[in-house]
Amino acid sequence: MDGFDVSQAPREYQAVKPLADLFVLGMGLGWVINYVGMVYTSFKERTYGMAIMPLCCNIAWEIVYCVFHPSKSRVELGVFAMGLLINFGVMYAAIIFSSREWSHAPLVERNLPWIFCIGVLGFLTGHLALAAEIGPSLAYSWGAVVCQLLLSVGGLCQLLCRGSTRGASYTLWLSRFLGSCCTVGFASLRWMYWPQSFAWLNSPLVLWSLAVFLMVDGSYGVCFWYVEQYEKSVLMGRATKAM
C-alpha cells in the first residue's frame, strides 16, 4: 500500500475515516476562508496578503495534486480543486497590487509578473521532481510540509518587514492556522490507524516541522497584536499633534 489510495486502507482507518474526512473539510473551510479573505483584502487595501514565494509554492503544489497526481479521495480532491480555483484569484490580486509594495526595489517592481511566473514554474517542477524521486504519496506530504513552513515563516517576515497590518487580519491568520491544525489532525489519524503507510509521520523531521509551524504561526498572532498597537499609537500621536 502506498498510503494514497484510501480504498486500500486497513479496517482500523476505515472506521475513523469519517473523522478524517471531517478534518479534511475543516482544512478546506479554513483555507477557503483564508483565500477568499485575501482576495477581498487585496482589492480593499490594494495590496497582497501572502508572501510571493509561499504563494508560488502553494499554488504549484495544488496544481500537482489536482492535475498530475490527483487524490483518489473525492473529499480531498474536491477540497484541493476548490482551493486551487480561489488561489488563482489570490495570485491575480497579488500580481495587480504587488508593485505598490516594491517601490523601494525598482528591479523587482518592474518584473513582478515574471517573478510570479518563474516562481510557480520553479516550484511546479520541484514538486513534480520530488514526486518522481520518492513517489507521489510521500511527496504529497513532504511538499505540503515545505508549503506550510514557507507560509508560516513568509507570513511572519512579511508582517514584521512591513511594520504594518496592511493586507493582514486576525481572520486571515486564524483561518490559516486552524485550517493547518486540521491537517495535523488528519495526519495524526493516518499515523495512528494506518501505520503500514504512515508510520514515518512520527519521524524527527516531521515533528521538528510541526514544532516550527506551531511556534511561528502561534507567534504571528502576538506579533500582529503588537504591530496593530504600534499603528494605533502612531495614529493617536498624529491626532494629538493636529489638535
Curated annotation (Swiss-Prot):
UniProt-recorded Gene Ontology molecular function terms: lyase activity
E.C. code: 4.2.3.-
Localization of this protein: Membrane
Matching InterPro entries: PaxB-like
Enzyme class: lyase
TM ranges: 19-39, 48-68, 77-97, 112-132, 134-154, 172-194, 205-225
Keyword Transferase: no
Signal sequence extent: none
Record's keyword terms, sorted: Lyase, Membrane, Transmembrane, Transmembrane helix
Membrane topology: Multi-pass membrane protein
Calcium recorded as keyword: no
SS bond partners: none
Pathway: Secondary metabolite biosynthesis
Any GO CC annotation of this UniProt entry: membrane
Matches recorded under Pfam families: Pyr4-TMTC (PF25129)
Major place of residence: membrane
Domain of life, source organism: Eukaryota
Role, per record: Terpene cyclase; part of the gene cluster that mediates the biosynthesis of the indole diterpenes janthitremanes such as shearinine K or shearinine A. The geranylgeranyl diphosphate (GGPP) synthase janG catalyzes the first step in janthitremane biosynthesis via conversion of farnesyl pyrophosphate and isopentyl pyrophosphate into geranylgeranyl pyrophosphate (GGPP). Condensation of indole-3-glycerol phosphate with GGPP by the prenyl transferase janC then forms 3-geranylgeranylindole (3-GGI).
Family: Belongs to the paxB family.
UniProt protein name: Terpene cyclase janB
Gene source species: Penicillium janthinellum
Biological classification of the source: Eukaryota, Fungi, Dikarya, Ascomycota, Pezizomycotina
Gene behind this protein: janB
